[in-house]
């Protein structure tokens, strides 16, 4: 007796084979996806009703406290603690949000006490199937990819995310336990490729701007800045010629300063009272009373000579 397990989408089917490898008779019941089973256990736990619980009619469930739900409950069932990734997974399985003011979700096969209906919930298929070689290309050539020569990502991977609360860069680590590793890896690779293309375009635009600025500077220097002319005269001769050119003007300025009325002579020495009570003659501020006495002495000598001659 042997068992063969096949994965059909997200549904695991077990078939019993015959003793000789032929097709067995009985086919086992379909098993729901692990994500649905874990979500049902998470919602049905009465100890966490203050965080997540069933709705009023037991056909919906409500996440009352998303921060605590992501921090305390998600790591116990999944390999992440991202509430946005959990919401995206619900969307891929056909869950819809009931009201806009709270996180209440519903699916016609997700009901309290009806765990056997979980096998009827299937993962949504993308509207445009990817090309056949694409699912195997990342695993075979991902070490030789050139980020600047990758083809644009197929549009099929951009239409299956209907609820967007977070960038798609974290999608590759959100559904590690439900069989969607290949699609998530392709989505993450496409997002990285798109970011690289955006950065490349920004760098090219910045390079073009710098080239234009460089050309403008060269044009300005060539058309608005005069070239420096070289002379054969030495700096010493040039300085002497400039000094000779300015020397007469400096001399005239100096003479004007001497002849100007603003230039006052030094103050005269203090006057001494005259002994004979007469006016004294001064020359450059010096009294000449001694010369007057000498003149009187000459007069006396002349009178004396005349008397002797008589």
Swiss-Prot record:
Annotated region (Disordered), positions in chain: 124-147, 257-310
SMART domains: HSF (SM00415)
Disulphide connectivity of cysteines: none
Residue ranges, compositional bias (Pro residues): 263-272
Motif (Nuclear localization signal) on chain: 291-297
SUPFAM superfamilies: Winged helix' DNA-binding domain
UniProt xrefs under InterPro entries: HSF_DNA-bd, WH-like_DNA-bd_sf, WH_DNA-bd_sf
MF terms in GO: DNA-binding transcription factor activity; identical protein binding; sequence-specific DNA binding
Region (Hydrophobic repeat HR-A/B): 196-225
A single GO cellular-component term on record: nucleus
Family: Belongs to the HSF family. Class B subfamily.
Function: Transcriptional activator that specifically binds DNA of heat shock promoter elements (HSE).
Name the UniProt record assigns to this protein: Heat stress transcription factor B-4b
